[in-house]
Design a protein with these regions (language model features):
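A short, glycine-centered helix-capping/turn motif at helix boundaries
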Residues: 147, 156-181, 279-283, 293-295
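Short, polar N-cap/turn motifs at the start of nucleic acid-interacting alpha helices
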Residues: 261-262, 282-305
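Active-site/catalytic core of tyrosine-dependent DNA strand-transfer enzymes
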Residues: 210-268, 272, 277
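Basic, Lys/Arg- and aromatic-enriched nucleic-acid-binding interface segment
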Residues: 130-166
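Non-catalytic DNA-binding core/recognition domains of DNA-processing enzymes
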Residues: 23-105, 266, 270
Length: 306
């Protein structure tokens, strides 16, 4: 009876089969039509083009969905495909273990929407106000005095994957044997320049963020430390570490001042990832960038400004 799951069909053939399978299921015609379209499409993106390959291995199926250039990528659109698979398993396959696994992927896919609201992502009007091209921001950085706090701030949000307002109390360790006294720190020696972030918004999901400073960023940091030796990456006028809120407030004011228009750290993160996507960065690299920014690949798509 289940032979159809393991056979290869054209999209139209599989569409007809799925419509027939759902014929007597008490669901709306709209839902049935959606499943009959989305599931065959999704199967066509897989290395093994069968329904069984799709339903048995959600990780591979979702990776293929994320990689295909044939659809618009957003959590909302992915939800339609994942929901179709969940419905097929719930009503047709009726495998509780498989359903539980797919429901977990469905839940993860839905998180970016809630995360977007929690992050207070900019509105369309705010986007327009902060629509400074990435290259223009980089140009402004290079025009600022070497070693200045504003130049270093822009450097840490453009020359490395930009995190949230998590640099507020980032300790600088110049000896690898030193034990950090803060959750967030940079190990800066003659042979190593490593950022470690343990206190950040999504730490329960991602545990920690680790990143290696680029050569250009190392030069920016060294110039700043030569000009103002200190224990922390960014400090107040009396050389103390910022609180998260005070750092965010200072950073937004500093960015707005030097860029001569409204700018926030969130907007800068949007501009960074939009630039990467516009540069046709590979899906694999985009996933790595998302991890270093402390969020999911789907959340990264929310960050893209068209």
């Amino acid at each position: 009876m289940d032979d159809y799951l393991h056979k290869t069909y054209t999209e139209e053939e599989l569409k007809t089969i799925i419509l027939d399978i759902f014929k007597d299921i008490p669901l709306s015609d709209t839902s049935k039509k959606q499943y009959s379209v989305k599931l065959p499409q999704w199967v066509s993106y897989l290395p093994i083009k069968t329904l069984a390959a799709l339903l048995d291995d959600p990780a591979t199926a979702i990776a293929a969905l994320e990689e295909t250039p044939k659809i618009k990528h957003s959590p909302a659109n992915h939800h339609i495909y994942i929901g179709s698979a969940v419905a097929f398993i719930r009503h047709i396959i009726k495998d509780e273990a498989k359903l539980k696994k797919w429901k977990e992927y469905e839940r993860k896919n839905s998180e970016p929407i809630a995360e977007r609201y929690a992050e207070n992502a900019p509105s369309e009007l705010q986007k327009d106000k902060a629509a400074v091209p990435f290259d223009e921001i980089d140009k402004v950085r290079k025009q600022l005095p070497p070693g200045s706090a504003e130049r270093l701030l822009i450097a840490f949000y453009t020359l490395i994957e930009p995190i949230r307002a998590d640099y507020y109390a980032t300790e600088i360790l110049t000896d690898e044997s030193q034990e950090p006294t803060e959750e967030n720190y940079i190990v800066l020696t003659t042979t190593k320049a490593q950022l470690v972030v343990r206190d950040f918004k999504t730490k329960e999901r991602y545990e920690k963020i680790e990143n290696t400073l680029s050569d250009e960023l190392i030069e920016e940091l060294k110039a700043s430390l030569d000009k103002k030796p200190r224990k922390y990456l960014f400090v107040t006028e009396d050389m103390k570490a910022y609180t998260r809120k005070l750092f965010s407030n200072w950073a937004c004011r500093a960015l707005t001042r030097v860029l001569k228009q409204p700018m926030t750290l969130t907007a800068l993160r949007h501009i960074y990832i939009t630039k990467k996507i516009q540069d046709n960065t590979s899906g694999k690299e985009l996933r790595q960038i998302a991890t270093k920014m402390g969020h999911s690949r789907d959340m990264q798509r929310v960050y893209e400004w068209q």
